A protein has these predicted regions:
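An accessory alpha-helical subdomain
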Residues: 148-279
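Conserved N-terminal glycine/acidic-rich loop preference
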Residues: 2, 11-14, 50-54, 98
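Rossmann-fold dinucleotide-binding core
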Residues: 85, 91-152, 156
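Rossmann-like NAD(P)-binding element
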Residues: 44-69
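Glycine-rich, N-terminal phosphate-binding loop of Rossmann-like dinucleotide-binding domains
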Residues: 55-57, 82, 123
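ADP-ribose/adenylate-binding Rossmann-like module
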Residues: 71-87
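NAD(P)+-binding Rossmann beta1-loop-alpha1 motif at the extreme N-terminus of oxidoreductases
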Residues: 1-44
Length: 279
Protein backbone atom coordinates (compact mmCIF):
# COMPACT_ATOMS: atom_id res chain seq x y z
CA UNK A 1 0.00 0.00 0.00
CA UNK A 2 1.33 3.42 -0.97
CA UNK A 3 2.16 5.78 1.88
CA UNK A 4 1.59 9.52 1.70
CA UNK A 5 4.28 11.83 3.01
CA UNK A 6 4.32 15.63 3.06
CA UNK A 7 7.45 17.77 3.50
CA UNK A 8 6.79 21.23 4.95
CA UNK A 9 9.55 23.41 3.53
CA UNK A 10 9.95 20.88 0.76
CA UNK A 11 11.25 23.40 -1.76
CA UNK A 12 14.33 23.95 0.39
CA UNK A 13 17.51 22.00 -0.24
CA UNK A 14 16.82 19.21 2.27
CA UNK A 15 13.25 18.91 1.06
CA UNK A 16 14.42 18.58 -2.53
CA UNK A 17 16.98 15.97 -1.45
CA UNK A 18 14.19 13.98 0.24
CA UNK A 19 12.11 14.17 -2.91
CA UNK A 20 14.99 12.93 -5.08
CA UNK A 21 15.95 10.07 -2.75
CA UNK A 22 12.38 8.90 -2.24
CA UNK A 23 11.56 8.98 -5.96
CA UNK A 24 14.57 6.75 -6.68
CA UNK A 25 14.67 4.45 -3.66
CA UNK A 26 11.21 4.58 -2.02
CA UNK A 27 8.73 4.93 -4.90
CA UNK A 28 6.04 3.39 -2.70
CA UNK A 29 5.86 6.75 -0.90
CA UNK A 30 3.80 9.47 -2.61
CA UNK A 31 5.56 12.69 -1.66
CA UNK A 32 3.86 16.09 -1.46
CA UNK A 33 5.75 19.38 -1.21
CA UNK A 34 4.28 22.02 1.10
CA UNK A 35 5.65 25.55 0.72
CA UNK A 36 4.82 29.02 2.01
CA UNK A 37 1.97 29.58 -0.45
CA UNK A 38 0.17 26.46 0.80
CA UNK A 39 -0.65 28.12 4.14
CA UNK A 40 -3.56 29.78 2.34
CA UNK A 41 -5.35 26.39 2.33
CA UNK A 42 -3.17 24.08 4.49
CA UNK A 43 -5.80 21.38 4.93
CA UNK A 44 -5.62 20.54 1.21
CA UNK A 45 -2.12 19.09 1.57
CA UNK A 46 -1.84 18.26 5.27
CA UNK A 47 -5.03 16.25 5.70
CA UNK A 48 -4.91 12.48 5.17
CA UNK A 49 -1.12 12.25 5.16
CA UNK A 50 0.59 9.24 6.71
CA UNK A 51 3.70 11.27 7.58
CA UNK A 52 4.39 15.00 7.81
CA UNK A 53 8.03 16.12 8.14
CA UNK A 54 9.07 19.67 9.00
CA UNK A 55 12.13 20.85 7.08
CA UNK A 56 12.25 24.49 8.13
CA UNK A 57 14.81 26.87 9.73
CA UNK A 58 15.49 26.26 13.43
CA UNK A 59 14.03 29.59 14.52
CA UNK A 60 10.72 28.81 12.80
CA UNK A 61 10.35 25.21 13.95
CA UNK A 62 8.25 25.73 17.08
CA UNK A 63 5.93 28.16 15.31
CA UNK A 64 5.43 25.80 12.35
CA UNK A 65 4.82 22.81 14.64
CA UNK A 66 1.96 24.64 16.36
CA UNK A 67 0.67 25.96 13.04
CA UNK A 68 0.68 22.48 11.45
CA UNK A 69 -0.91 20.30 14.14
CA UNK A 70 -4.55 21.48 13.80
CA UNK A 71 -4.63 20.30 10.17
CA UNK A 72 -3.24 16.80 10.72
CA UNK A 73 -5.48 13.77 10.47
CA UNK A 74 -5.70 11.33 13.36
CA UNK A 75 -2.73 8.97 13.33
CA UNK A 76 -0.50 11.09 11.07
CA UNK A 77 3.17 10.74 12.05
CA UNK A 78 4.74 14.11 12.87
CA UNK A 79 8.52 14.41 12.44
CA UNK A 80 11.16 17.09 11.95
CA UNK A 81 14.59 17.47 10.34
CA UNK A 82 15.88 20.13 12.76
CA UNK A 83 19.57 19.93 13.67
CA UNK A 84 18.71 20.41 17.35
CA UNK A 85 16.36 17.87 18.79
CA UNK A 86 15.23 18.55 22.37
CA UNK A 87 13.24 21.75 21.82
CA UNK A 88 11.34 20.64 18.69
CA UNK A 89 10.73 17.16 20.10
CA UNK A 90 9.41 18.62 23.36
CA UNK A 91 7.14 20.94 21.39
CA UNK A 92 5.73 18.15 19.23
CA UNK A 93 5.18 15.92 22.28
CA UNK A 94 3.44 18.68 24.22
CA UNK A 95 1.17 19.85 21.42
CA UNK A 96 0.33 16.71 19.41
CA UNK A 97 -1.50 13.56 20.50
CA UNK A 98 -0.38 11.40 17.57
CA UNK A 99 2.90 9.61 16.75
CA UNK A 100 6.01 11.81 17.07
CA UNK A 101 9.65 11.20 16.11
CA UNK A 102 12.67 13.48 15.80
CA UNK A 103 15.00 13.03 12.81
CA UNK A 104 18.33 14.63 11.96
CA UNK A 105 19.91 13.73 8.60
CA UNK A 106 23.69 14.02 9.19
CA UNK A 107 24.53 14.93 5.60
CA UNK A 108 24.07 17.74 3.13
CA UNK A 109 21.45 18.10 0.42
CA UNK A 110 23.74 17.00 -2.43
CA UNK A 111 23.77 13.24 -1.73
CA UNK A 112 22.59 11.01 -4.58
CA UNK A 113 22.36 7.76 -2.62
CA UNK A 114 21.33 6.86 0.94
CA UNK A 115 24.10 4.27 1.26
CA UNK A 116 25.86 4.68 4.64
CA UNK A 117 24.42 8.16 5.20
CA UNK A 118 23.52 8.67 8.86
CA UNK A 119 20.10 9.69 10.14
CA UNK A 120 19.77 10.26 13.89
CA UNK A 121 16.43 9.06 15.27
CA UNK A 122 15.14 10.40 18.60
CA UNK A 123 12.10 8.46 19.72
CA UNK A 124 9.07 10.49 20.70
CA UNK A 125 5.85 8.55 21.30
CA UNK A 126 3.80 5.76 19.71
CA UNK A 127 6.94 4.21 18.24
CA UNK A 128 4.94 1.23 16.99
CA UNK A 129 3.11 3.61 14.62
CA UNK A 130 6.24 5.07 12.98
CA UNK A 131 8.74 2.20 13.20
CA UNK A 132 7.86 1.00 9.68
CA UNK A 133 9.13 4.32 8.30
CA UNK A 134 12.45 4.03 10.15
CA UNK A 135 12.76 0.43 8.93
CA UNK A 136 12.19 1.58 5.33
CA UNK A 137 14.93 4.21 5.67
CA UNK A 138 17.31 1.52 6.94
CA UNK A 139 16.27 -0.89 4.19
CA UNK A 140 17.37 1.46 1.41
CA UNK A 141 20.79 2.02 3.00
CA UNK A 142 20.54 4.82 5.54
CA UNK A 143 22.51 4.17 8.74
CA UNK A 144 20.10 4.72 11.64
CA UNK A 145 21.58 6.00 14.91
CA UNK A 146 19.15 6.03 17.82
CA UNK A 147 19.77 8.30 20.80
CA UNK A 148 17.94 10.63 23.14
CA UNK A 149 17.41 14.25 22.15
CA UNK A 150 19.70 15.30 25.02
CA UNK A 151 22.52 13.03 23.83
CA UNK A 152 22.11 14.33 20.29
CA UNK A 153 22.20 17.99 21.25
CA UNK A 154 25.23 17.55 23.51
CA UNK A 155 27.15 15.86 20.68
CA UNK A 156 26.05 18.47 18.13
CA UNK A 157 27.28 21.28 20.36
CA UNK A 158 30.77 20.05 19.49
CA UNK A 159 30.23 18.53 16.04
CA UNK A 160 28.33 21.52 14.67
CA UNK A 161 28.61 24.35 17.18
CA UNK A 162 32.32 24.42 18.07
CA UNK A 163 33.45 23.06 14.70
CA UNK A 164 31.46 25.51 12.57
CA UNK A 165 32.37 28.41 14.86
CA UNK A 166 36.08 27.55 14.54
CA UNK A 167 35.86 27.43 10.74
CA UNK A 168 33.84 30.66 10.69
CA UNK A 169 36.49 32.42 12.80
CA UNK A 170 39.30 31.17 10.58
CA UNK A 171 37.55 32.51 7.48
CA UNK A 172 36.85 35.81 9.23
CA UNK A 173 40.50 36.12 10.29
CA UNK A 174 41.74 35.34 6.76
CA UNK A 175 39.57 38.20 5.50
CA UNK A 176 40.73 40.45 8.36
CA UNK A 177 44.35 39.88 7.32
CA UNK A 178 43.40 40.11 3.62
CA UNK A 179 45.21 36.86 2.90
CA UNK A 180 45.75 35.90 -0.75
CA UNK A 181 43.96 32.54 -0.77
CA UNK A 182 45.16 31.55 -4.25
CA UNK A 183 48.78 32.08 -3.18
CA UNK A 184 48.14 30.04 -0.03
CA UNK A 185 46.71 27.19 -2.12
CA UNK A 186 49.84 27.13 -4.29
CA UNK A 187 52.04 26.79 -1.21
CA UNK A 188 49.75 24.61 0.91
CA UNK A 189 50.39 21.00 1.81
CA UNK A 190 47.55 18.60 0.90
CA UNK A 191 46.25 18.64 4.48
CA UNK A 192 46.19 22.43 4.71
CA UNK A 193 44.65 22.64 1.24
CA UNK A 194 41.87 20.39 2.52
CA UNK A 195 41.38 22.67 5.54
CA UNK A 196 41.15 25.73 3.29
CA UNK A 197 38.56 23.95 1.16
CA UNK A 198 36.52 23.23 4.30
CA UNK A 199 36.59 26.96 5.10
CA UNK A 200 35.53 27.78 1.55
CA UNK A 201 32.79 25.16 1.69
CA UNK A 202 31.22 26.76 4.77
CA UNK A 203 31.25 30.25 3.26
CA UNK A 204 29.76 29.01 -0.02
CA UNK A 205 26.50 28.33 1.82
CA UNK A 206 23.84 30.52 3.42
CA UNK A 207 24.84 32.69 6.40
CA UNK A 208 21.40 32.34 7.98
CA UNK A 209 21.77 28.56 8.12
CA UNK A 210 25.05 28.77 10.01
CA UNK A 211 23.84 31.54 12.30
CA UNK A 212 20.95 29.23 13.24
CA UNK A 213 23.24 26.23 13.76
CA UNK A 214 25.96 28.02 15.74
CA UNK A 215 23.51 29.96 17.93
CA UNK A 216 20.77 27.31 18.06
CA UNK A 217 20.34 27.32 21.85
CA UNK A 218 21.73 28.81 25.06
CA UNK A 219 23.78 25.74 25.92
CA UNK A 220 25.58 25.89 22.58
CA UNK A 221 26.18 29.64 22.89
CA UNK A 222 27.61 29.20 26.39
CA UNK A 223 29.86 26.33 25.31
CA UNK A 224 31.20 28.39 22.40
CA UNK A 225 31.91 31.27 24.79
CA UNK A 226 33.72 28.83 27.10
CA UNK A 227 35.70 27.53 24.10
CA UNK A 228 36.69 31.09 23.13
CA UNK A 229 37.96 31.77 26.66
CA UNK A 230 39.91 28.50 26.56
CA UNK A 231 41.50 29.47 23.22
CA UNK A 232 42.42 32.89 24.58
CA UNK A 233 44.10 31.41 27.65
CA UNK A 234 46.18 29.11 25.46
CA UNK A 235 46.97 31.92 23.03
CA UNK A 236 48.43 33.88 25.94
CA UNK A 237 50.79 30.99 26.70
CA UNK A 238 51.86 30.89 23.05
CA UNK A 239 52.38 34.67 23.11
CA UNK A 240 54.56 34.22 26.20
CA UNK A 241 56.61 31.57 24.41
CA UNK A 242 55.65 28.91 26.96
CA UNK A 243 56.75 25.85 25.00
CA UNK A 244 56.81 23.62 28.05
CA UNK A 245 53.09 24.04 28.73
CA UNK A 246 52.35 23.57 25.02
CA UNK A 247 54.29 20.30 24.90
CA UNK A 248 52.70 19.01 28.11
CA UNK A 249 49.21 19.81 26.81
CA UNK A 250 50.00 18.23 23.45
CA UNK A 251 51.14 15.01 25.11
CA UNK A 252 48.11 14.97 27.41
CA UNK A 253 45.67 15.25 24.49
CA UNK A 254 47.55 12.62 22.51
CA UNK A 255 47.33 10.20 25.45
CA UNK A 256 43.64 11.03 25.98
CA UNK A 257 42.85 10.31 22.32
CA UNK A 258 44.48 6.90 22.45
CA UNK A 259 44.22 4.95 19.20
CA UNK A 260 42.14 7.67 17.56
CA UNK A 261 45.19 9.89 16.87
CA UNK A 262 47.29 7.39 14.85
CA UNK A 263 44.16 6.04 13.14
CA UNK A 264 43.21 9.58 12.11
CA UNK A 265 46.64 10.02 10.54
CA UNK A 266 46.08 6.89 8.46
CA UNK A 267 42.51 7.83 7.56
CA UNK A 268 43.44 11.31 6.34
CA UNK A 269 46.34 9.89 4.33
CA UNK A 270 43.92 7.52 2.58
CA UNK A 271 41.46 10.34 1.95
CA UNK A 272 44.14 12.61 0.54
CA UNK A 273 45.41 9.89 -1.77
CA UNK A 274 41.87 9.36 -3.09
CA UNK A 275 41.28 13.09 -3.57
CA UNK A 276 44.75 14.12 -4.75
CA UNK A 277 43.37 15.68 -7.92
CA UNK A 278 41.15 18.29 -6.24
CA UNK A 279 41.97 21.97 -6.63
Amino acid sequence: MQKRICIIGGNGEMGQMTQNIFSKFLPEYALTIFDESDWQTPEQKLANQDIVILSVPIYLTDEIIKKTIPYLSEGTILADYTSIKKEPLDSMLANYDGPVVGLHPIFGPTISSPENQVIVVCDGKQQDKYQYFIDDLARIGFSIEKMTAEEHDEAMTFIQGIEHFSVYCLGLFLKHKNVDIQKMLKLASPVYKMELNIVGRLFSQGPGLYADIIMSDKQRQQTIAEFAEFVNSNAEKVSDGDKQTFIENFKAVKEWMGDFAPQSYKNTDKLLLKKKGYE
